[in-house]
């Protein structure tokens, strides 16, 4: 019931239900549908006004749409939805999650994503990167995310299917340039191949170009690292390098007792040459290696700024991607490979950080292809 002036205008419940059904059949997004419902109710009222001999115009339409009565109906039957709060509720409410996930996720999968201790609100929630793309997906279902003309994605091999969808929404009516190396895919949910990624991006027919020639890493180093490809990226051909240097690769065996001396020697040899140097190792081993170097008086720094001015940097393998150094010592490849579900991918990243010289230092047996 809407009161305007001395007249009252009534829109029956059944008619409003019909308006809602029509919008749902069109498949409009939630936010757009909410706005359209207000307009359609106003249109029904204006039709009744015209039938009663009145002459409403666009200003009347807007005024009716904004009335307290119309807004109350829209709020009741098509409430506003906040994407952050929607995902928060979904991950906190087992019954709601089960209802939404019926036929899509089994009980174990629902348990994996459900929060055991629901937060009080969005501000106290411990959001993850995976949760962020759920919020982005929800946001697009509510209000269409506008497309850009062109999107460039680097390190695309690390994108999950949901992250691909988030990128795809931003180039839905535009174009994209996607760059990556499947051998360096170190995230647990990374897509398996490029056709799968392009499908999730919404660009299944996009052109695929293989970049198989390198200039940064010497051939001897690249050939050694490429031995891992059959295990980490089956079907990906080994890249070729134009640079050759017979002395660019050294594989050094040590015993647990001789590891400190061997590490110090490898670092000293690297520091005797011009350029930057780094030790890359499994994250959990870095502290022990730092103590070995400290006891020997070898100055070193870290990525977070400790040891400013030192030419030698200790790098956890989880942060090595995208970095490059003139000289690299990869310590204990077997520990790198065993420390993560994609440890061999991380090892491949570590082995390809050197642009001049690579030393592989090990006490534990090397992963099979590197022996």
Regions of interest found by a model, annotated:
Residues 2-150, 159-165:
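Conserved helicase NTPase catalytic core signature
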Residues 135-150, 157-371:
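Conserved helicase motor core of SF1/SF2 NTP-dependent helicases
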């Amino acid at each position: 019931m809407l009161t305007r002036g001395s007249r009252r205008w009534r829109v029956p419940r059944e008619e409003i239900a019909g308006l809602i059904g029509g919008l749902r059949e069109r498949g409009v997004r939630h936010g757009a549908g909410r706005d359209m419902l207000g307009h359609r109710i106003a249109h029904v009222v204006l039709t009744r006004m015209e039938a009663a001999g009145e002459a409403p115009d666009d200003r009347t339409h807007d005024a009716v749409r904004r009335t307290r009565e119309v807004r109350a109906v829209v709020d009741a039957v098509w409430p506003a939805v906040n994407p952050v709060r929607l995902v928060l509720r979904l991950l906190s409410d087992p019954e709601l999650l089960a209802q939404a996930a019926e036929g899509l996720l089994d009980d174990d999968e629902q348990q994996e994503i459900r929060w055991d201790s629901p937060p009080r609100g969005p501000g106290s929630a411990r959001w993850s990167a995976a949760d962020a793309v759920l919020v982005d997906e929800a946001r697009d279902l509510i209000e269409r995310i506008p497309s850009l003309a062109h999107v460039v994605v680097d390190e695309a091999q690390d994108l999950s299917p949901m992250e691909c969808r988030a990128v795809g929404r931003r180039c839905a009516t535009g174009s994209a340039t996607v760059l990556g190396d499947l051998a360096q895919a170190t995230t647990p949910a990374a897509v398996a191949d490029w056709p799968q990624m392009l499908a999730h991006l919404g660009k299944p027919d996009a052109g695929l170009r293989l970049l198989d020639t390198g200039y940064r890493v010497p051939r001897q180093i690249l050939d050694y690292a490429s031995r891992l490809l059959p295990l980490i990226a089956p079907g990906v051909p080994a890249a070729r390098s134009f640079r050759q240097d017979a002395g660019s690769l050294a594989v050094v065996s040590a015993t647990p007792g001789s590891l400190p001396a061997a590490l110090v020697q490898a670092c000293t040899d690297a520091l005797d040459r011009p350029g930057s140097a780094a030790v890359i190792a499994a994250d959990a081993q870095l502290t022990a290696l730092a103590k070995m170097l400290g006891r020997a008086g070898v100055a070193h720094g870290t990525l977070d700024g400790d040891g400013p001015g030192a030419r030698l940097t200790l790098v956890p393998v989880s942060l090595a991607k995208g970095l490059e150094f003139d000289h690299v010592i990869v310590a204990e490849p077997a520990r790198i490979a065993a420390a993560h579900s994609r440890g061999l991918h991380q090892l491949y990243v570590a082995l390809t950080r050197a642009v001049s010289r690579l030393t592989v230092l090990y006490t534990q047996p090397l992963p099979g292809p590197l022996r």
